[in-house]
Swiss-Prot record:
This is Glutamyl-tRNA(Gln) amidotransferase subunit B, mitochondrial. It comes from Lachancea thermotolerans (strain ATCC 56472 / CBS 6340 / NRRL Y-8284) (Yeast). InterPro entries: Asn/Gln-tRNA_amidoTrfase_suB/E, Asn/Gln-tRNA_Trfase_suB/E_cat, Asn/Gln_amidotransferase, Asn/Gln_tRNA_amidoTrase-B-like, GatB, GatB_Yqey_C_2, Gln-tRNA_amidoTrfase_suB_CS, Gln_synth/guanido_kin_cat_dom. The keyword Chloroplast does not apply. This protein may be expected to contain an N-terminal transit peptide but none has been predicted. One of its GO terms (cellular component) is mitochondrion. PROSITE patterns: GATB.
């Protein structure tokens, strides 16, 4: 049967490609109303504990390729006589995730052995929780206002969370004709999350993966990176109630979505051609090649894992008080933080709120999301006190997100170091100087960069003196200027314009917006110290503009 199935499938796929070639995995895809997609996800997440799951080895699965098998112990490599000892930090991390996902923690969960033979699994079995998982049920709520889905809300129900150990890693050296084994990843703690098949479109799947990544990063239990393998996603998919197909080898979100698109189209094609009963009547596992899905195994060849309770490990017994204590110590979850930031008095746009509240992995060496959010909230509080009724919520938002973060990245200056010499109170004072027109926005930007640059070079530890800097660099806004001096500046700017048609257009009124160009030149020359309306008035008088 196996010998005839693959050629037939290949022949069909050739026909399918001809019929549906325009519906590629990345272009022109749409779900058809008569062919209902149903998806569930299985997500394996590596936990960022200090040590591995059942040993004292350092948990560093991404150790340099020059140090293979470096972070290993006797148990990790399965030397005879070595025994597992549960890492309690794993239990804490698992409890945090279960609470955040509204799951019911099993107060007496057990470990089991899942038997199979593979080169990077030296024990011949994996320790997992097949019969009595760590937590059951729960959900993750997707919101249209936050997660870019079509529905107002979509609740994705969860089946369970279970603790298990990761395998080693096979490194294929094709040029040498051999495979190498790196056990740095062996026995790294994983949490496997299994969802109900509640997903009915791609937006929901993309949103769930992103939201789950944000959650584990926010809780500080994992990096959540798909590209490095710290998070791995398998997809269970069916169309119109036919048998489930499991998709594997999905290294990133793009691959996950492309594989689902391709597999959906493949199954729709089989149903439309009347061959669904032949090819979709039993479950199978398929891999993603980057352009198509290929069969790995079917129900008939499913491995018998011979699960059995692990006799060397006791149960994980947790008291209700422990779960309650963990719950009470949890930080606000991302959705709650976003809601707060988008409400009064902050009134942030969703994009800006996510920059402050959602942890990314690009700037970990400069600031944590917790420290950034705290700096913003403290600055806003100080500014609010100073501004009183003149509060402009956008001012601290724009200056922290765009100017402060931009300069920190440019200078590679950690926020913690910057905050020592330029604390939130001082930042609020700078904002008030700008708001009260004591200095221009342009001068404020120059001043902020100068302060951060000096902190970076000199490691300043004391708060800066803004008044002294403004006086020293002569940055005060010029509210009154001698008319002749201003006319002289404008005359010099107009004389430097090489295109006479620009001036003619301004005078005639045909190019009124070109006057803004001249004003901009004046602002540049004066470094923003002369107000724009003074330049506008002076240019109109100089050019005898009558409109």
């Amino acid at each position: 049967m196996g010998c005839t199935f693959l050629p037939l499938e290949s022949a069909f796929m050739l026909q399918f490609t001809r019929c549906f070639g325009s519906r590629t995995a990345n272009k022109g895809f749409q779900l058809l109303p008569d062919f209902k997609l149903k998806c569930g996800l299985e997500i394996h997440t590596q936990l960022s504990t200090q040590n591995k799951l059942f040993s004292l080895s350092t948990n560093d699965p991404f150790a340099s390729a020059n140090l293979p098998n470096h972070h290993t112990s006797f148990f990790d490599v399965s030397l005879p006589g070595s025994q597992p000892k549960l890492n309690p930090e794993v239990v804490l991390f698992a409890t945090k995730l279960a609470v955040a996902l509204n799951s019911k923690v099993n107060l007496n969960s057990h470990f089991d052995r899942k038997h199979y033979f593979y080169a990077d699994q030296p024990m011949g079995y994996q320790i997992t929780q097949h019969y009595s998982p760590f937590a059951k049920g729960g959900f993750l709520e997707l919101l249209g206002s936050l997660d870019s889905i079509d529905e107002n809300s979509k609740r994705i129900q969860l089946v369970q969370l279970q603790i298990e150990q990761d395998t080693g890693k096979s490194v294929y050296r094709g040029s040498e004709g051999r495979s190498l084994i790196d056990l740095n990843r062996s026995n790294v703690p994983l949490i496997e999350l299994v969802t109900q098949p509640n997903f009915t479109d791609l937006k929901q799947i993309r949103a769930f993966i992103k939201k789950f990544q944000n959650l584990v990063r926010h809780l500080g239990i994992s990096t959540g990176d798909l590209e490095t393998g710290a998070m791995r996603v398998d997809v269970n998919l069916s169309v119109n109630g036919y048998s489930r197909v499991e998709l594997k080898n999905l290294p990133n979100t793009s691959s996950i979505l492309s594989a689902i698109k391709y597999e959906y189209q493949r199954q729709v094609g089989l149903i439309q051609s009347g061959e669904a009963d032949k090819y979709l009547s039993s479950s199978e596992t398929r891999g993603w090649t980057g352009s198509s899905t290929v069969k790995l195994r079917s129900k008939e060849t499913t491995i018998d894992y011979r699960y059995m309770p692990d006799p060397e490990l006791p149960s994980i017994k947790i008291s209700p008080g422990t779960v309650q204590s963990v719950s009470q110590s949890m930080p606000k979850l991302p959705d709650a933080v976003l809601h707060d930031l988008m409400s009064e008095p902050y009134g942030l746009a969703l994009k800006d709120a996510k920059i402050l509240a959602i942890k990314g992995n690009g700037h970990d060496q400069l600031y944590t999301q917790t420290s950034l959010l705290k700096y913003y909230l403290d600055t806003f509080s100080c500014y609010s006190t100073l501004a009183g009724q003149q509060l402009n919520p956008r001012l601290p938002t724009n200056w922290i997100i765009h100017e402060l973060l931009g300069n920190l990245n440019r200078l590679q200056l950690p926020l913690e170091k910057a905050a020592e010499a330029f604390p939130p109170k001082k930042f609020a004072e700078l904002l008030m100087l700008i708001q009260d027109d004591k200095i221009s926005k342009a001068s404020g930007k120059l001043l902020l960069f100068h302060i951060l640059n000096e902190i970076n070079k000199l490691s300043l530890a004391q708060p800066v003196d803004l008044s002294a800097l403004i006086e020293g660099f002569d940055l005060n806004v010029i509210k009154k200027i001698d008319a002749n001096e201003l006319r002289e500046i404008c005359t010099e700017i107009v004389g430097g314009i090489s295109d006479p048609k620009l001036i003619e257009g301004i005078v005639s009124g045909k190019k009124k917006n070109s006057l803004k160009f001249l004003i901009g030149q004046g602002m540049r020359v004066s470094q923003g110290r002369i107000k724009p309306h003074l330049f506008e008035q002076a240019f109109k008088e100089l050019l005898k503009v009558k409109w």
